[in-house]
Design a protein with these regions (language model features):
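Noncatalytic regulatory segments and standalone regulatory/sensor domains
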Residues: 1-4, 9-11, 17, 25-32, ...
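Contiguous, structured surface segment used for ligand recognition
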Residues: 2, 30-60
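A local structural micro-motif
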Residues: 17-19, 49
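Phosphate-binding active sites in nucleotide-utilizing proteins
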Residues: 146-165
């Protein structure tokens, strides 16, 4: 299951690798608060600002953004005149402003700049991730292929054809 950090980078269309982002997220001491999310986004070059919107006017926000609800974080994707569309635990939801305002604390993490955002050493990490996936897939395929080739080349020795006669 993807973390909020992965979902947010997806919403921003920022390149990342699964291994690097999960290690960063799991090892971060503040992964469950806005400070930690901000610091992890800094690693990717996403400049963010933590704000408190006192009047809770959702239309004043830049989207996508991270919104703090009571005990959780959601990713605000877009805000219309009457509804807000957001992502919570990987599920997209649309709610009326009034319903969402009951759970939103007014705290948000908004993006200031993300045009050049990317994972540090992204190309190296991507190459390593592809190589790892290839090893994971190639070894079983080679094993199965060698069994099939071995059986085919020794079909007379096994006696399968003699049984069919």
């Amino acid at each position: 299951m993807k973390t909020i950090l992965e979902h947010f980078l997806d919403a921003l269309d920022v390149g990342y690798t699964r291994h690097f982002i999960r290690a960063l997220y799991q090892e971060h001491p503040h992964k469950n608060n806005m400070y930690g999310l901000k610091r992890m986004l800094d690693v990717y070059g996403v400049k963010t600002l933590g704000v408190y919107v006192e009047n809770k006017n959702l239309s004043e926000m830049n989207y996508p953004c991270i919104l703090h609800t009571h005990g959780d974080f959601v990713i605000g994707l877009e805000c219309g005149a009457e509804n807000i569309r957001f992502l919570q635990h990987g599920r997209e939801t649309t709610l009326a402003h009034d319903a969402f305002l009951h759970t939103w604390t007014g705290n948000a993490l908004v993006v200031q700049e993300a045009t050049e955002a990317v994972e540090p050493d992204y190309k190296i990490h991507l190459r390593e991730e592809i190589a790892s996936m290839a090893k994971t897939c190639i070894i079983p395929v080679m094993l199965i292929l060698s069994v099939v080739v071995g059986m085919a080349s020794n079909i007379n020795d096994i006696g399968i054809l003699h049984m069919a006669r």
